[in-house]
Every structure is written in C-alpha cells, then in structure tokens.
Amino acid sequence: IGFSMVVLLSGTLTGIIAICQWLTLDAHIPGMVNMQNAVRPYANFAQPNNMATFLIMSLLGCVYLYEKQKIKTWVLSLCSFILIFAVALSQSRTSWVACLCILVYGAYQQYKGLITLKWYYTLAWLALFIGLIALLPIATQWIGQVTNVDIAQTKTAAERATGDMSRLAIWEQMLHAILDRPWWGYGWNQTSVAYTLVSDHFQG
C-alpha cells in the first residue's frame, strides 16, 4: 500500500509537470525542466515513452488503492484524470499497447470476481483516454489561437500510428545482423558494431 501511494503521488506530480510543459508554463516555473524544442511532454523523464510507462504504473497503483479503499474515490478520480491526460499528451504508442493488455487482464480479473471495480467504470476511463487522444490536437490548436501562446503541438492518432516507420526498418536490419551471427554474436554492448557490419550488405 505504501509503495502504491508513493507511485501514485509521484505519478500525479509527473502528470502535472507534463501538463505544464504542454502549456509551455515550464519556462516560467522554477525547478521545472524546460522542454525547449521538444514536441512531446516528458515531465521529469528524459523520454515521453518512459514517462508514459511510469504513469501507467501509477494508474495501476490507483486501481490497487481503490480496491483497498485506502483513499477517497474522488481523490483517486482526480489523480486518474491527471494521469490519463498526461499519458494522452505523451502520444506514446507503447501506452496504447499497454492499455490494451491491462484491459484484457482486468476483464479476466473481473470475470473471476477478483476485483470490485465495475466494468462500466473501466469503459468510461477508456472512453476518456480515447477522447483525449482524439481531441488534444484540436484543443492544442484552439488554445494556441485564443492565447497566442506557442504551446507544444500534438499529432493526431492517425499520424502517431502511421508516422515514423523508420523504426521497423531498423528492427529489420538488426534481424539480419542476428541471422548473420546467430551463435557468437558481436560481443557485449556492441550493437553499433552489428549495425555497421550489416549495413554493408543490407540497407535498412
């Protein structure tokens, strides 16, 4: 319980920082990391995907505390909203996959009667998450026009889902590197060596 409370508190603070970065308030608040030219908020993490993963852990901590009834429901709901909002701001595709896995696992737990969280609450939070992902680009543009503030631009879900496919090419190239030396490899921490050698005969 103590660990869940710490994770929830730090996750909520992380979410608040991410929201401030989205609104470009980070440049005016002492002690907060200035995003500068970064597009996706990352709060006190160096990378948006890392932040999103931690925020999902915080959400799971929130569910645990709800099940144990250690914190009032309205407090947990407020924290959950901040966490979900920040996850949507991160535009992390990793979080989309994680949410899908958690939903499947949660549905199984509900079927077995191991958790008391109602299925319609879960669907409501999922709908909120999807709605935030869909509406954030519109909200970002509107806030920028109304306030004349250059806030961090967010991409649409379609752009995030289909954009930057270069990662797949890199994975394909690394697969060829593994097939070239399946037994002895390239040595500890020698990924760059593998990349250089495979580039001679396979361009990713």
Predicted features, each with a name:
Residues 1-142, 194:
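Alpha-helical transmembrane segments of multi-pass inner-membrane proteins
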Residues 47, 159, 166-204:
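TM-adjacent membrane-interface loops and short helices in multi-pass inner/ER membrane proteins
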Residues 40-44, 102, 133-173, 196:
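Flexible juxtamembrane loops connecting transmembrane helices in multi-pass membrane enzymes
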Residues 32-35, 45-48, 54, 146-154, ...:
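Surface-exposed loop/turn and secondary-structure junction residues enriched for glycine/proline
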